Amino acid sequence: MIGATNRRGAIGREILHNIINYEFEGKVFPVNPTKTVIHSIKCYSTILDVPDAVDLAVIVVPKELVLNVVDQCGEKGVKGLVVITAGFKEVGEAGAKLEEKLLAKVRQYGMRMIGPN
């Protein structure tokens, strides 16, 4: 969960809350460079700091950070992404160009993606 937070009303809080409270039985790794613990779970600065293998990353960071996060996921060997972040083709030409770059990175690393947004 990249972009996890404790901030009420934030999508990164709500998704993490749902994952840990509604019968998901796998491991969950919150990622946020400014936190050490979220929802009583150790938090990592980047996906690269997570000691275990990660098969799916849920991404809820600002659009300006998504490409870098995808690179980190690729380096980590993550094969699946769910990109919740908004600001891609739904906002116009600049967003569409950013989405094209995102898709190119996903293909470069051989990942599968749901999203963005």
Would you name each region that the model predicts?
Residues 2-117:
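Catalytic-core regions of core metabolic enzymes
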